[in-house]
């Protein structure tokens, strides 16, 4: 301090312009107001943590998409067959996941509004019905994948047997047509057996007029004639009691009808009867909901799916003819009561056997 004062005094006396030393300069700066000597802050140097995270996520997503696109192009160029299977599998997972979310939403609405299955709209009922079948098949594949290293074998089996182990979400467009033809061929094998059982049962019908009408109907179908709706409805009394009511069907009849409905026939007779009745009741409920909605409100794919469920191989039939056939089915179904649903079950064979191109 004494030295600095001496320097300043000498400078004042001599009128010199000598600058103070670095130590003195720093002391003078420290003596001034504090904030004045600091450098101004720059907002660009201090980004918020949220902005940094968003920029990082955006960068990672962009890079991932670019790498994924390059990977897809590589597979498409060098492994086209594998790439087709890969894209079909990935799309199938997305569609199955979307179906699961939709089914969950429908079930939640049913619980909140205290609705029963038959009180839903047609599309909601059909979605739940189909999703239950799909998820049952997926659960079976999941169960056989549980043992260690079994998942590798399951992937191989899914590649070799896609029709048996995979649902339609994982089929290619060509496979969908081919597999539906295969399934229809399986159920067509039972058509002649179902008609034979009907002819045999006609001998036990007590009413003479009904017995003759049932025999004539079997003869028409066996000769290649498509029956009219009024001819089928005239026999509704035969299917409410012995010998063709649900409770009176024999085991061989139920096995043949199960094959016609694409259900397993290898179950005890009580389970076969219960399962056939349950599926027929669901179809009857769907028919009532569809009649309320109107066939004209359905898309072409929805019409084909509805016809296929009811026994018609609609994959090779024009849309207008599918709608006409579905109209005949609904006319019969909506005229039946619950005790007469055995006729609706047999309708799977009676109405589909000789309809247009379905007979091959």
Curated annotation (Swiss-Prot):
User: Membrane-spanning residues where?
Assistant: 138-158
Q: What topology does it adopt in the membrane?
A: Single-pass membrane protein
Which residues does the annotated region (Required and sufficient for mitochondrial import) include? 1-110
Q: Where in the cell is it found?
A: Mitochondrion outer membrane; Nucleus; Mitochondrion inner membrane
Identify the residue ranges that face the Cytoplasmic compartment according to the record: 1-137
Q: What residue ranges lie in the Mitochondrial intermembrane compartment?
A: 159-360
Q: Name one GO molecular function term.
A: molecular adaptor activity
Q: Which residues form a coiled coil?
A: none
> What exactly does this protein do?
Plays an essential role for mitochondrial structure and function, as well as thermogenesis of brown adipocytes. In brown adipose tissue also localizes in the nucleus where it interacts with the chromatin remodeler SMARCA4 to regulate thermogenic genes expression, such as UCP1. May regulate phagocytosis and inflammatory responses to lipopolysaccharide in macrophages. Involved in tumorigenesis and may function as a negative regulator of the p53/TP53.
User: Subunit info?
Assistant: Interacts with BRI3BP. Interacts (via C-terminal) with SMARCA4; the interaction regulates transcriptional expression of thermogenic genes in brown adipose tissue.
PANTHER family of this UniProt entry? LETM1 DOMAIN-CONTAINING PROTEIN 1, LEUCINE ZIPPER-EF-HAND CONTAINING TRANSMEMBRANE PROTEIN
The name this protein goes by in its record: LETM1 domain-containing protein 1
> What gene is this protein a product of?
Letmd1
């Amino acid at each position: 301090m004494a030295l600095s004062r001496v320097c300043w005094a000498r400078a004042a006396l001599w009128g010199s312009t000598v600058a103070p030393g670095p130590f003195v300069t720093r002391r003078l700066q420290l003596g001034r107001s504090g904030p004045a000597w600091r450098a101004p802050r720059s907002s660009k140097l201090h980004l918020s943590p949220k902005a940094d995270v968003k920029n990082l996520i955006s960068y990672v997503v962009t890079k991932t998409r670019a790498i994924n696109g390059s990977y897809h192009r590589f597979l498409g160029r060098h492994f086209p067959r594998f790439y087709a299977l890969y894209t079909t599998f990935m799309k199938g997972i997305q569609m199955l996941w979307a179906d699961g979310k939709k089914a969950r939403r429908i079930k939640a609405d049913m619980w909140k509004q205290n609705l029963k299955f038959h009180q839903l709209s047609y599309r909601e009922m059909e979605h739940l019905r189909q999703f239950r079948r799909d998820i049952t098949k997926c659960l079976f594949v999941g169960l056989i994948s549980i043992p260690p290293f079994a998942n590798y074998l399951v992937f191989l089996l899914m590649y070799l047997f896609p029709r048996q182990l995979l649902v339609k979400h994982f089929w290619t467009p060509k496979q969908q047509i081919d597999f539906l033809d295969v399934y229809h061929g399986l159920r067509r094998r039972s058509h002649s057996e179902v008609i034979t059982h009907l002819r045999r049962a006609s001998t036990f019908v007590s009413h003479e007029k009904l017995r003759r009408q049932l025999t004539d109907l079997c003869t028409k179908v066996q000769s290649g004639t498509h029956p009219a709706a009024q001819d089928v409805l005239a026999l509704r009394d035969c299917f409410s009691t012995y010998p063709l009511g649900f409770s009176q069907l024999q085991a061989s009849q139920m096995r043949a009808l199960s094959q016609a409905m694409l259900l397993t026939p290898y179950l005890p007779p009580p389970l076969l009867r219960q399962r056939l009745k349950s599926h027929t009741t669901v179809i009857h409920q769907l028919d009532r909901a569809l009649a309320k909605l109107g066939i004209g409100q359905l898309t072409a794919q929805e019409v084909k799916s509805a016809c296929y469920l009811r026994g018609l191989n609609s994959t090779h039939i024009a849309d207008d003819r599918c709608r006409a056939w579905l109209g005949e089915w609904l006319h019969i179904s909506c005229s039946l009561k619950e005790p007469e649903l055995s006729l609706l079950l047999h309708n799977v064979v009676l109405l589909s056997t000789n309809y247009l191109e379905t007979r091959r």
